[in-house]
Structures are given as C-alpha cells and as structure tokens.
From Swiss-Prot:
Disease as annotated in the protein's UniProt record: Defects in HACE1 are a cause of Wilms tumor (WT). WT is a pediatric malignancy of kidney and one of the most common solid cancers in childhood. HACE1 is epigenetically down-regulated in sporadic Wilms tumor. Moreover, a t(5;6)(q21;q21) translocation that truncates HACE1 has been found in a child with bilateral, young-onset Wilms tumor. Spastic paraplegia and psychomotor retardation with or without seizures: A form of spastic paraplegia, a neurodegenerative disorder characterized by a slow, gradual, progressive weakness and spasticity of the lower limbs. Rate of progression and the severity of symptoms are quite variable. Initial symptoms may include difficulty with balance, weakness and stiffness in the legs, muscle spasms, and dragging the toes when walking. In some forms of the disorder, bladder symptoms (such as incontinence) may appear, or the weakness and stiffness may spread to other parts of the body.
Effect after changing L704D: Dimeric; loss of E3 ubiquitin ligase activity
Activity regulation, per record: Sterically autoinhibited in its dimeric state.
Gene designation: HACE1
Native source organism of the sequence: Homo sapiens
Subcellular location, record wording: Golgi apparatus, Golgi stack membrane; Cytoplasm; Endoplasmic reticulum
Post-translational modification summary for this protein: Autoubiquitinated.
UniProt ANK repeat ranges: 23-55, 64-93, 97-126, 130-159, 163-192, 196-226, 228-253
GO molecular function: small GTPase binding; ubiquitin protein ligase activity; ubiquitin-protein transferase activity
Protein name: E3 ubiquitin-protein ligase HACE1
UniProt catalytic activity: S-ubiquitinyl-[E2 ubiquitin-conjugating enzyme]-L-cysteine + [acceptor protein]-L-lysine = [E2 ubiquitin-conjugating enzyme]-L-cysteine + N(6)-ubiquitinyl-[acceptor protein]-L-lysine
Amino acid sequence: MERAMEQLNRLTRSLRRARTVELPEDNETAVYTLMPMVMADQHRSVSELLSNSKFDVNYAFGRVKRSLLHIAANCGSVECLVLLLKKGANPNYQDISGCTPLHLAARNGQKKCMSKLLEYSADVNICNNEGLTAIHWLAVNGRTELLHDLVQHVSDVDVEDAMGQTALHVACQNGHKTTVQCLLDSGADINRPNVSGATPLYFACSHGQRDTAQILLLRGAKYLPDKNGVTPLDLCVQGGYGETCEVLIQYHPRLFQTIIQMTQNEDLRENMLRQVLEHLSQQSESQYLKILTSLAEVATTNGHKLLSLSSNYDAQMKSLLRIVRMFCHVFRIGPSSPSNGIDMGYNGNKTPRSQVFKPLELLWHSLDEWLVLIATELMKNKRDSTEITSILLKQKGQDQDAASIPPFEPPGPGSYENLSTGTRESKPDALAGRQEASADCQDVISMTANRLSAVIQAFYMCCSCQMPPGMTSPRFIEFVCKHDEVLKCFVNRNPKIIFDHFHFLLECPELMSRFMHIIKAQPFKDRCEWFYEHLHSGQPDSDMVHRPVNENDILLVHRDSIFRSSCEVVSKANCAKLKQGIAVRFHGEEGMGQGVVREWFDILSNEIVNPDYALFTQSADGTTFQPNSNSYVNPDHLNYFRFAGQILGLALNHRQLVNIYFTRSFYKHILGIPVNYQDVASIDPEYAKNLQWILDNDISDLGLELTFSVETDVFGAMEEVPLKPGGGSILVTQNNKAEYVQLVTELRMTRAIQPQINAFLQGFHMFIPPSLIQLFDEYELELLLSGMPEIDVSDWIKNTEYTSGYEREDPVIQWFWEVVEDITQEERVLLLQFVTGSSRVPHGGFANIMGGSGLQNFTIAAVPYTPNLLPTSSTCINMLKLPEYPSKEILKDRLLVALHCGSYGYTMA
C-alpha cells in the first residue's frame, strides 16, 4: 500500500511538471534526459533528478565522448556547471578530440564558467589532440579580458600546438590587437618560429593584419623569412595587402626597392602587386613620384635586356610589358590624371609627373636607333638589288631596262647555275658580297622584329597613359609614320606580331588604315581570337562570369510578345552588365540558363524580320533581308532598329548565333565598307544588270540623255532626286558613267535607308566597337553572326560524346544517326534546336558549340525505355536524353514527335 502511494505521488509530480521526476537506471538513457536541462541551465530540475540517482556525472556519451560538464561549459550553463562540479565532475576530463570543459568555455567566451572551472582546479596547460590550450582558443577569438584572467594561471605563455604555433601566432593572424598586446605583456616570445619557421610577424602579414604587424614591429619584432625563404613582404604582396606593406616599409625602408623589383616576378599575381603599388602611391605626392620613377628605371633596364639578342625573348618581353602595365596604372590613378583634366605633360609642359618618364627616354632612344639602323640596311639592300639586277642583265647580254625587272631576292644554293656564265664560281665577288649583306639584313630582322615590336608596344602604352581617354598620342603617331616601312617589313615577315604587340592599331583608325591590308590577310581564326580578346579585355575574370545571377539582372520576357517585351527590358538594362552576361526567363516558365538564352536569341532574330514590324524586307533571292526604306510606316521604327542593333551586338559579344541572314550590302554598312553596283542585285537584279551594261559598253553615241538625277516615289508622287548638287543638269557621259553608277548605287543602297542604318549601328556599337568589327569582311561577319547555313551530319557524328551507358557502336546510336541522315534538313535544324537551343552551327562546326560554361560537345545520354517515352534534352549542356528504344522505327517516330511538339518551352528538370 505504501509503495503504491509513492508511485502515485511520482506520477502526479511528473504530470504536473510535464517531465520525468527520476532518472532511468542506465547512464546512456539518463544522460539524454539530463542534457537538454543542462543546456537550458535548469539546475533545480537537474539537482532533483541527481539527488536520488546513481548516475555517473563523468559519464561520456555521444560520438565525441563528452560529459555533461562539457555541455554546461560549452553552453555557458554556469549553475549546472557548479552543480556538476560539486557532484564530483572531473574538470580535466578530455573528450575524443582532447578538449576539456575549460577549452570549450574559452572557445565560446564563457567567462563565469571559466572562473568556476579554475576554482575547481581545471588545468590551463592541458593540450587537445592538436596541441591547442585554452589560451590558444582565447587568442583565436580575441577574448582579451578572459585572457588577462587566465594567463596568470599559465605556466608557459608560449606553449605550442602541433604545428609549433603559439597563442601569439594565432592572435596576430586574426588581427586581435589587444590580445597581442596582452600576450606580449605576459612575456610571449615575439620572434618565436613555428615548425616551418614562420614568426608572429609572418602570420600577421599572411592575412594583411596591418595593426598587429605594427604592434609587433614597434616592439622590436625581427623581419625573418620562413624555412622556404618566403618573407612577410612576399605574403603581403601575394595577398595585395597594401596597408601592411606600408607598415613594413616604415620600419624597413629597404623593402621599397624589393617591392619594385617584384614587378619582374612572373610568379606574383599582377593584380595583387598592382593593388599594393596603388595603395603606396596614394600616401604622398613624393612617394607617388618615387614609385613611378623606380618603375620607369626597372622598365628601362628590362627593355635594354630585351633588345639584347642574347637574352631570353619570352621572359624579358613578359617582364617589360608587365612592368609597363603597372607603371601606367599607377600613373593614371595619381592625383593628377588625364581623366580629371589636369595637365600631365602631354601638352609639352614639364611637370613633375611628366618627368617620371625621363628614365624611359633612354629605352625609346635605343628603339629609335634600332629602327633607323634597320631602315638604312633595307634601303641599302634595295640599292644593291638594283645594282645586282644590272650585273645579271649584263651577264646575260640583255639590253632591258633594270627597272622592269622584279626586285632582287637573295637566291638559294645553285641558283646561279642557269646563268650564261654556266658555273657558280663565275659569280663576281662584289655580287656575292651584296647577296651576303642582304641575307644578313634579313637575319637581323628575324632576330629583332619580335623584340623591337614588344618595346614598341611598351612605348605605345606609356604614350597613351599620358593622354586623355579616346585620344592617340601625337608623338606615337609621328613615331609610326616615321618607321612605317620597317614596321610593315616586320609584319610581312611575321604577321603574328600584329596580334601579339600592335594592339595600338585597334585604338587609332589612322594607324589601322596603314596595316589593314596586312591584317585582313591573316587567318580568320587568328582575327577572331584577337577580336574576342580585346572585346572582353577589362571585363571580370572568367571565374566571375558564372557567379549567382542577381534577380534584378534577369531579362523577364513574354513569349507571346517577345519582340516588344524584349525591347523594353533591354532598353532599361545596364549595358555593362549585359556585356558580362545575360540571364533570360520567359514569363510563367521556370527554366533559366544558356539553353534559354540561345532560344531567346533564336526566336528574337526571327521576330526582327517579322513583316508586321516593317523593319526589313526580303531580298530578291528570298533568303536574305535588307532594311526597309519604308519602315517609317511604323512610328517606332528607329527605336526598333536600334534594338535590332543591340540584339545582334549582344549575340556577337556572347558568341550566340542568330537565325537570320542579311544582304551583303547591309553587312558592309555594319563594317563601314562602301557599297558598289553589284550589291544592287540583292534588291533589284534587273536594275543591277542595267548598271553593269552601262559600265561594259560605250554610251557615247547611244543618246541615253541620262543626267545625274533619278525619279523616285515619295509618298505616292514621283520626284526627281539629284545624285549630286546640280545633278539634274549634268549629263552622264562615257567619262563620268562610273561616278554615275556609284552615286545611284549609294542612293538605292545607302541614302534611302540612312536613318535606319544609323539607328541600327547606334545599338550595335553599344556592344561591338567599330574598330574591332572592321577586322572582318562582309562574308566573315555573316559567319560570325549566323554560323554555317548547312548541317554537316558527318561533322556532327564526329563531335558527339556518349554517356550513361551509350557507346558509339550501340544499336540505338546506330539507328539514331541513320534517322538523322534520313530526315529533312529542316528536321535536323529542329533536332539541333531541341538539344542546344540554337538552330545554327557555329563557324568551325560542331566542335565549337558552346555550353553553359564554354565549349560543350553534343552529348547523347542513355535513358531506360518505357512505352511511348519521348526523348528529352538539357540545353545548357547540349545533352539529348535518348531512351533505349527497341527498334529504329519506334526511335524515329518518338524523335519526330518530340521535335515537332516539344522544341519550345522550358521547365525545371
């Protein structure tokens, strides 16, 4: 009866308190009953449960084998912690990682728990498995107040962890100033190295901790490298920590020159070193000038080494251009720069800032001497060539004028065997000497062209940084004009020099015109690489392109009004952000990514030539489009032409293909190439034939009575439009007919659509600079914009990958390619669009198809077959998910259903 009453009382208490009132007998179950109470510091409940229990307060549980005292110390449950200590909990018990309750209290800054643990003889010198003590944890987190209390109990403030690091090391690394001062005041060794030889100063510099580095240096810290020779300054420069470098230089001035010399080190990231120099140059005018002068001197030394034929060309070239880039960057960001309109000497004024270029004048003088020397040798060889030709003519007994003979080229072995004298030995000694001199000159050009061209590039960079944006240095233009013949000789000998060093051509139309014929003679692939290299210069690194998309930057468009909605969002978007990347989402659809972007360009390009907008008309061949001279029927036509230019510019910028082809004349307008009468054939073939007839025949006695004017329809009325001032009274004759044909061509092909062309180019040039696009002709521009018009199935097969179980020899794959061969060209285009999001193959074929993160081959992945299952695709990675169909017939049926019914629309996979 008494026992039953006791059980009833326990039940009542339990129900009233909504918890158990006694612990289970086994420790494992009991500890999980107590743990939440300890974490909540419910010390009365814990005390009551422990009072009538045999629970072991030192019982270790869980994966890390901690006791309840660990839990209390970790959570700051000071009342429960005291209770457990009074019950006999061991303050020095270590969990599986070697941590004691004191470690956990120190790590989390539980001051009261630490004090109580110390009262109960917690050992502050115990290390965990990594060698960390309680003071290490306090130093890591900068808990200076607690450190003051604890350090008096520590036997060795320089106790090391497993890596030989003391509390001072970690406090310096994390930038805790007061903690560092406390440790130093307590006798910490300021120069103590860890196992790799790194001192506290080294640790402070490794994370750019300027303040802790300054404290250490003020207290006499030594500037010491680690065991690998890496110095604190090396770490500061590697991290771009300009402020910390500044502190090091204050205490060790010799390090200034060390930083300057680091500009030659290819292993150091240029952008980090540039950050350091930028910060240092902002500290004072004198330091700014000192940095620039020092960089100019180093650049001059490197430039002269580059001009030495015994030096390593590649290493010296990279070093010179690297130094000059940094020099120009620092020069521009100074207090006086071209961007803020303050004169810097480019008008001839000898300001202090212009004087920093003085050391470089030695290099430019050497460059000029080299070019003059080569020009002299070239001129001498030309004279010798004429003399040699005369000698050869005399030997043959000919009376022809030497001027009619092609310029002399040094003959190869045996080339004199056909001379009338019959043997090589009969060649005059003077002739041999001149030939050798010519060969020597060619050898000198071969050996020096790249070196001199690199110095020319450096010269251009230095001239440009002294000029306001958009202006080319008159001095540099004069330099190129002076050495025009030699530079063209360099380029003719090695055309790659243009792409490697003559970047100035892209920024100066006057100079570009001198070399354009040479540039356009270079392979299309090389010009494409040069185009995109400079188009994307100055944009974020490639690893930043795939950063998470900002929701505000997504172009949200409506599929049912894609033209107008796209025009609206693109006109409002940030142009610079659109250059970096495009994110498109169709209203009401979830999908995003490169596949959606490709589809957007594909559909939008078709809408641009939609007759409803009256922007473009179809040419005579029915396959290309030309701006519509009557587009004014659409009140917004010029805004729409500007938008069309933006879309084509964006597509070219991001290597996306558009699904339209334009007339040759329109491509010429984009490129700035004059049209000719042959271009008229695209809009009026019969009229083009008439123009051709005029040019091919003598019209003197035909009585055509043509004048330099034409009749044209202006709002339904015929009006006479002069081709030039007073054209109505100027007769077309045999002598001026070519001018007439050109002027009437310009009227039909240019003047009639000039406002439309101007609006289009305004949008196009927002993304594609005119100086870059002129690298191509009209045929190449079509390839860049629209890709290859035909799909080469053999090339498709060659550049396809297989995954998820498929291999090239599998029957399903064999059937698939047989089906691709059988279907129409239009269905192949649908298949390509179904998988990649684009209906065009880029120039270079399927090997150049782009995916979400660069080049991505067409891929076919195996999918288990179920009846009626259709193929699906992942357009971002150009992947066709093809079920393992049991027969070719079923495969073809299901594939065509997917192509004709599922080519548009995106959902999340």
